[in-house]
């Protein structure tokens, strides 16, 4: 048996060698295989390296080469994100190294540095200056400059580096760094990172790494190996990285997280939001701020599992993403207070009024320690007290302040003192100025168009509504997340009283309102609060008076997210255009034009004509013709079709009485 098996094996091997020899004999070395060349291989079957065109991009102090094909992700829209991150990490390094007696030097900053910005003044140059502290005689200050290794500096990780642009910018623009780990799971991306590191001469600071970001962070859980700064900017949701991130960041370290899955966080898929972030998102006008608070809740919830908690420094909603900067601390006593920092949201589906219900209750005791217990609720009745509609339940979400205004002021002051440092400095100043004006203890907001559309009245101006709230002794502010937001500590009843008073100046035709509509029920109640719409000087915020760039319009076409990076992918612009072409005319029902809509509406009888109240006559978009009587099958004659009936055929309309 063994001999026969060996003989069969040798026979098959000889047959393969013979067939291969015949193939190469037929494929003459002098004649290249044109079919193989067309398929992307060499003339004799070997694989040829695919020619990839590369593009060089200069952003900040970095110069990056990346392939034009969509193999490595790069989005120029995120320049504001990267500029803001550099500014935040710089101030964080100033705080951390300042405690060690190390001063950082930022190119463009003067010896006298601004430390306080007086936002109450209209002149943007009116800033308080503070001289640097005098050192003791004979002492030499320790300094840290950009591009140099600081042995006591920050250990930074960029978990999803792609082309390495962000990490290289950290090395070239942020002082006080010990090392920067630029990690990515893609081999193509890591090769590009190595090339860009050599191109910018930052190999002494930036360390390329190829690994799964989660496993890399899990391997740095030890206190001595943790990172001082972790930056996560994934394509889509960062939910799968948060558990590892809260364990790998050092005590008091900085965690920078970007979420670009705004469709999920804004309430389009509440069940998906719950599976990723542990909270139900609601469709509301305040969805962008609620998205920020859901991300903060998710971070704090994951940190609590390891006796850690988060302290938000800055939370931004911009363009198509949200970005949060938090510090992570350890403390069992502080973790107990986390439940009282979260809240559920009861939102009326009719008028949009919302109420918050805290998950926990913290009360003080004579000994000085806080006592925690379950909260009592709910804060609403089954039906809305304003319009009688039902409530939707969302959350939990972070209900505490989402910004550290002192830290925001430091970043704003540094950017204002050195406007040439970033390309988007003007926008950073505008957004941070609005943030400093926000009410820190008031979650969520209403919008002008929401309030007016609910009762079908004209929209008051921003200054008129803000003045009415200020005259009623309520606080009011804008929100960086929405340009027509009204963030106020006034209850919903006071807001609707103000809108009732406004409606009296611009009356609504009550006969057009349904008795069950929110507008009818709200306007049927007389206001208890008499609103005063006289414009007040303090109703116009300082950032608006100074004309800062607070809410940037899209500067170019296709301003938004880019396609995901794919191996061997097409150029980003080409891929987007092909996607648009493939999706054209793929709707279930093509949009109808004006004539088609008018013809369709004419098939419906006019209800007001039946009641005798329609005054439009022939101009009415609905039909005034009497309904055609239906002919039952029993009453139909048995005679054949007459000559005046239309014979059936293509495009023939159905006769009277036929459904």
Swiss-Prot record:
UniProt-annotated stretches for the region Disordered: 537-578, 616-659
Alphabetized GO MF terms: RNA binding; tRNA (guanine(26)-N2)-dimethyltransferase activity; tRNA binding; zinc ion binding
EC numbers for this chain: 2.1.1.216
Zn finger residue spans: C3H1-type: 600-627
Cystine pairs: none
Residues flagged as site, (Microbial infection) Cleavage: 530-531
Phosphothreonine, modified sites: 628, 646
UniProt modified residues of type Phosphoserine: 120, 517, 625
InterPro entries membership: SAM-dependent_MTases_sf (IPR029063), Trm1 (IPR002905), tRNA_met_Trm1_C (IPR042296), Znf_CCCH (IPR000571), Znf_CCCH_sf (IPR036855)
Binding site for Zn(2+): 348, 351, 384, 387
Cellular component terms (Gene Ontology): cytoplasm; mitochondrion; nucleoplasm; nucleus
GO BP of this protein: tRNA modification; tRNA N2-guanine methylation
Key word Nucleus present: yes
Substitution effect: residue 323 to C: In MRT68; decreased tRNA guanine-dimethyltransferase activity
Location of the transit peptide in the chain: 1-23
The keyword Lipid metabolism is assigned to this record: no
Post-translational modification: (Microbial infection) Cleaved between Gln-530 and Ala-531 by the 3C-like proteinase nsp5 from human coronavirus SARS-CoV-2, leading to its inactivation.
Classification via Pfam families: TRM, zf-CCCH
EC category name: transferase
PANTHER family: N 2 ,N 2 -DIMETHYLGUANOSINE TRNA METHYLTRANSFERASE (PTHR10631), TRNA (GUANINE(26)-N(2))-DIMETHYLTRANSFERASE (PTHR10631:SF3)
NCBIfam families assigned to the protein according to its UniProt record, in alphabetical order: TRM1
Family the entry assigns: Belongs to the class I-like SAM-binding methyltransferase superfamily. Trm1 family.
Disorder this protein is connected to according to its UniProt record: Intellectual developmental disorder, autosomal recessive 68: A form of intellectual disability, a disorder characterized by significantly below average general intellectual functioning associated with impairments in adaptive behavior and manifested during the developmental period.
Function: Dimethylates a single guanine residue at position 26 of most nuclear- and mitochondrial-encoded tRNAs using S-adenosyl-L-methionine as donor of the methyl groups. tRNA guanine(26)-dimethylation is required for redox homeostasis and ensure proper cellular proliferation and oxidative stress survival.
Protein name: tRNA (guanine(26)-N(2))-dimethyltransferase
């Amino acid at each position: 048996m063994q001999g026969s098996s060996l003989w069969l094996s040798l026979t098959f091997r000889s047959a393969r060698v013979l067939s291969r020899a015949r193939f190469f004999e037929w494929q003459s070395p002098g004649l290249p295989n044109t079919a193989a060349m067309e398929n992307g291989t060499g003339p004799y079957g070997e694989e040829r390296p695919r020619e990839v065109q590369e593009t060089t991009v200069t952003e900040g102090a970095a110069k990056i080469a990346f392939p034009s094909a969509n193999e490595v992700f790069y989005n120029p829209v995120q320049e504001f994100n990267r500029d803001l991150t550099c500014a935040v990490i710089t101030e964080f390094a100033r705080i951390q190294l300042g405690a060690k007696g190390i001063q950082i030097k930022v190119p463009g900053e003067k010896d006298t540095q601004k430390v306080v910005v007086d936002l109450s003044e209209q002149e943007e140059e009116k800033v308080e200056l503070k001289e640097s502290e005098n050192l003791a005689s004979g002492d030499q200050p320790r300094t840290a400059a950009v591009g140099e290794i600081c042995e006591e500096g920050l250990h930074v990780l960029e978990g999803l580096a792609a082309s390495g642009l962000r990490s290289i910018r950290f090395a070239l623009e942020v002082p006080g760094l010990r090392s920067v780990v630029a990690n990515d799971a893609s081999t193509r991306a890591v090769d590009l990172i190595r090339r860009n590191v050599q191109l910018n001469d930052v190999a002494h600071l930036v360390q390329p790494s190829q690994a799964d970001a989660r496993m890399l962070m899990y391997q740095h859980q030890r206190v001595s190996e943790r990172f001082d700064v972790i930056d996560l900017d994934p394509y889509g949701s960062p939910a799968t990285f948060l558990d590892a991130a809260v364990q790998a960041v050092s005590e008091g370290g900085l965690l920078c997280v970007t979420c670009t899955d705004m469709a999920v966080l804004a309430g389009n898929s509440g069940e998906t939001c719950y599976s990723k972030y542990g909270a139900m998102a609601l469709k509301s006008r305040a969805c962008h701020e609620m998205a920020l608070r859901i991300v903060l809740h998710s971070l704090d919830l994951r940190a609590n599992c390891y006796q850690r908690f988060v302290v938000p420094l800055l939370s931004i909603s911009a363009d198509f993403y949200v970005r949060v900067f938090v510090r992570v601390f350890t403390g069992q006593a502080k973790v107990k207070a986390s439940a009282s920092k979260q809240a559920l949201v009861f939102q009326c589906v009719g008028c949009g009024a919302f109420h918050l219900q805290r998950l926990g209750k913290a009360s003080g005791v004579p000994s000085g320690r806080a006592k925690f217990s379950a909260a009592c609720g709910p804060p609403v009745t089954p039906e809305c007290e304003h319009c009688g509609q039902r409530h939707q339940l969302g959350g939990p979400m972070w209900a505490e302040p989402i910004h550290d205004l002192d830290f925001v002021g430091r970043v704003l002051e540094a950017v204002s003192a050195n406007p040439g440092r970033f390309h988007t400095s003007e926008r950073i100043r505008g957004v941070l100025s609005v943030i400093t004006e926000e009410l820190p203890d008031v979650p969520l907001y209403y919008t002008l168009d929401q309030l007016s559309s609910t009762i079908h009245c004209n929209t008051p101006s921003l200054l008129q509504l803000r003045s009415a709230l200020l005259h009623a002794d309520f606080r009011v502010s804008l929100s960086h997340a929405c340009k027509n937001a009204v963030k106020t500590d006034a209850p919903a009843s006071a807001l609707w009283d103000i809108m009732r008073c406004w409606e009296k100046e611009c009356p609504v035709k009550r006969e057009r309102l349904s008795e069950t509509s929110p507008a009818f029920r709200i306007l049927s109640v007389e206001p208890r609060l008499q609103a005063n719409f006289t414009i007040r000087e303090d109703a116009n915020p300082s950032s608006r008076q100074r004309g800062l760039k607070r809410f940037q319009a899209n500067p170019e076409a296709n301003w938004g997210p880019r396609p995901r990076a794919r191996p061997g992918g097409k150029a980003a612009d080409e891929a987007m255009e092909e996607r648009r072409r493939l999706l054209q005319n793929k709707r279930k029902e093509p949009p109808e034009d004006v004539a088609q809509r008018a013809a369709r509406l004419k098939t419906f009888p006019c209800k007001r004509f039946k009641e005798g109240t329609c005054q439009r006559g022939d101009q009415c978009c609905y039909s005034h013709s009497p309904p055609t009587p239906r002919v039952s099958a029993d009453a139909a004659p048995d005679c054949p079709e007459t000559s005046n009936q239309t014979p059936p055929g293509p495009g023939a309309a159905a006769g009277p009485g036929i459904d």
